[in-house]
C-alpha cells in the first residue's frame, strides 16, 4: 500500500455537558472541520505538522512523552503495541482546517486519525468501538488527560446530517436526524482554556465522589431524593448533572418531533445552568449566548469543558453568516481576544 489520506472530523456536543464522566447521556455530532493525515509505511515515525510548522522523528522503541503535539501520536502507538497489534512506523504530514484548542476536540480528532492511518496501513481490522476506546486510552493513560468517551466516540461514529444520542455507560447509541435547514454556528471565544484542566479535574473528582457517597454507578440512577444525601457543594454540582441528563432526553424527543424551537430553548437553559450552578462559563461565553439569542438564534450554549473555548448557536441556515458576522463585530469591540466563528453541520466520522 502506498500513501493514504485519512480525514478525521472535529466534534461539537449539542447537549450533555460534563455528564460523560459519571456515565450519563450525551449528544455529540462530528462536524465538517477536519484533521487530515497523509502517510505511508516507514521504518520509523517521521511526521510534519503544518499547524506547528514542525517535523518530529522518533523510533517505536522510544515512546517517551515530550510535552508536545507528538505525544498524541506516541500515545496511539503505545496503546496499539500494548494491546498486541503488529505495527511499524509511518511517514507523512498533518494538515486540515480544524482549529486547535478551540474546544472542538482537535486532540480526539488527531488521535483517531492517527489510529485510522495505522489501522489502514497495517490492516489491523480494528472495529469502530475499539477505535474509540483505544484513542481514549491513549489520551487517558499516555497523554494524561482524564477525558470521558464522548469526543473519541463522536469522531469515530459521526454520521452526516445526524447527531448521536449516546448512553456513556452502556455505549448504546442512536442516530437522530438533525434538520437540514438549521446550521450550527460555532463561536471560538479566543479564550484559551487554561483553567479547564484543573477545574475540569476538580468537577470530575467531586462528581465521582458523589457517586461513591450515593453508592451509584451512573448519574442516570440518581434521583432528586438522593441529592439530599450529598454535602452542599457536591449537591449543587451533582444536581446540575441530574438536570442535564434529563435535558438530553428532552432534546432527543424534541428532535424526533422536529421541534427545533424547543431544542433551542433547552440548550439555552442548559447554558445558564452550566454558568450559574456548575460554574464553568465565563464572561465571553455568556456574551455570545446573549447576543445570539438577541439576533434570533433558536438557542445557544457553551460546548466542551467551558472556561473559554467555544460556544454554539442553532440558527437558520440562510441567516448563519449574518448572525455570525454581527456577533463577531460586537465581540471584538468589547474583548481583545482573537475570536472567530465557523458554520458547521453534522458530518461522517473518520474515514479514508
Swiss-Prot record:
Mg(2+) binds at residues 107, 139. The lineage of its organism: Archaea, Methanobacteriati, Methanobacteriota, Thermococci, Thermococcales. It comes from Pyrococcus furiosus (strain ATCC 43587 / DSM 3638 / JCM 8422 / Vc1). The record marks 11 as: Transition state stabilizer. Optimum temperature is 90 degrees Celsius. One of its GO terms (molecular function) is magnesium ion binding. Its main location: cytoplasm. GO terms for cellular component: cytosol. It comes from the Archaea. The gene is galK. Substrate binds at residues 17-20, 200. Catalyzes the transfer of the gamma-phosphate of ATP to D-galactose to form alpha-D-galactose-1-phosphate (Gal-1-P). Is very specific for its substrate, since it is not able to use D-glucose, D-fructose, D-mannose, 2-deoxy-D-glucose, and D-glucosamine as substrates. Transmembrane segments: none annotated. Belongs to the GHMP kinase family. GalK subfamily. Coiled coil: none annotated. Keywords: ATP-binding, Carbohydrate metabolism, Cytoplasm, Galactose metabolism, Kinase, Magnesium, Metal-binding, Nucleotide-binding, Transferase. This is Galactokinase. Monomer. Its EC number is 2.7.1.6. InterPro entries: Galactokinase (IPR000705), Galactokinase_bac (IPR022963), Galactokinase_CS (IPR019741), GalKase_N (IPR019539), GHMP_kinase_C_dom (IPR013750), GHMP_kinase_C_sf (IPR036554), GHMP_kinase_N_dom (IPR006204), GHMP_knse_ATP-bd_CS (IPR006203).
Amino acid at each position: 500500500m502506498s500513501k493514504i489520506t485519512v480525514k478525521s472530523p472535529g466534534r461539537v456536543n449539542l447537549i450533555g455537558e460534563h455528564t460523560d464522566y459519571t456515565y450519563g447521556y450525551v449528544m455529540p455530532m462530528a462536524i465538517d472541520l477536519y484533521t487530515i493525515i497523509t502517510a505511508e509505511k516507514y521504518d520509523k515515525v517521521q511526521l510534519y505538522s503544518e499547524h506547528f510548522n514542525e517535523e518530529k522523528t522518533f523510533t517505536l522503541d522510544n515512546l517517551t512523552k515530550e510535552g508536545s503535539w507528538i505525544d498524541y501520536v506516541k500515545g496511539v502507538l503505545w496503546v496499539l503495541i500494548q494491546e498486541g497489534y503488529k505495527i511499524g512506523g509511518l511517514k507523512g504530514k498533518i494538515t486540515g482546517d480544524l482549529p486547535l484548542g478551540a474546544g472542538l476536540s482537535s486532540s480526539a480528532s488527531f488521535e483517531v486519525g492517527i489510529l485510522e492511518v495505522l489501522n489502514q496501513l497495517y490492516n489491523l481490522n480494528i472495529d469502530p468501538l475499539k477505535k474509540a476506546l483505544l484513542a481514549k486510552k491513549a489520551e487517558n493513560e499516555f497523554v494524561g488527560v482524564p477525558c470521558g468517551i464522548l469526543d473519541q466516540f463522536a469522531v469515530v461514529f459521526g454520521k452526516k446530517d445526524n447527531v448521536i444520542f449516546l448512553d456513556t455507560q452502556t455505549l448504546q447509541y442512536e442516530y437522530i436526524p438533525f434538520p437540514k435547514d438549521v446550521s450550527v454556528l460555532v463561536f471560538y471565544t479566543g479564550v484559551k482554556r487554561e483553567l479547564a484542566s484543573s477545574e475540569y479535574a476538580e468537577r470530575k473528582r467531586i462528581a465521582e465522589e458523589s457517586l461513591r457517597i450515593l453508592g451509584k454507578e451512573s448519574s442516570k440512577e440518581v434521583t432528586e431524593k438522593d441529592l439530599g444525601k450529598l454535602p452542599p457543594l457536591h449537591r449543587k454540582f451533582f444536581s446540575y448533572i441530574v438536570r442535564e441528563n434529563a435535558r438530553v432526553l428532552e432534546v432527543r424527543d424534541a428532535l424526533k418531533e422536529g421541534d427545533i424551537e424547543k431544542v433551542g430553548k433547552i440548550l439555552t437553559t442548559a447554558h445558564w445552568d452550566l454558568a450559574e450552578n456548575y460554574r464553568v462559563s465565563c464572561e465571553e461565553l455568556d456574551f455570545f449566548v446573549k447576543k445570539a439569542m438577541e439576533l434570533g438564534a433558536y438557542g445557544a450554549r457553551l460546548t466542551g469543558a467551558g472556561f473559554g473555548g467555544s460556544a454554539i448557536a442553532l440558527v437558520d441556515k440562510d441567516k448563519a453568516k449574518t448572525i455570525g458576522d454581527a456577533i463577531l463585530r460586537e465581540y471584538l469591540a468589547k474583548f481583545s481576544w482573537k475570536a472567530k466563528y465557523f458554520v458547521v453541520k453534522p458530518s461522517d466520522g473518520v474515514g479514508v
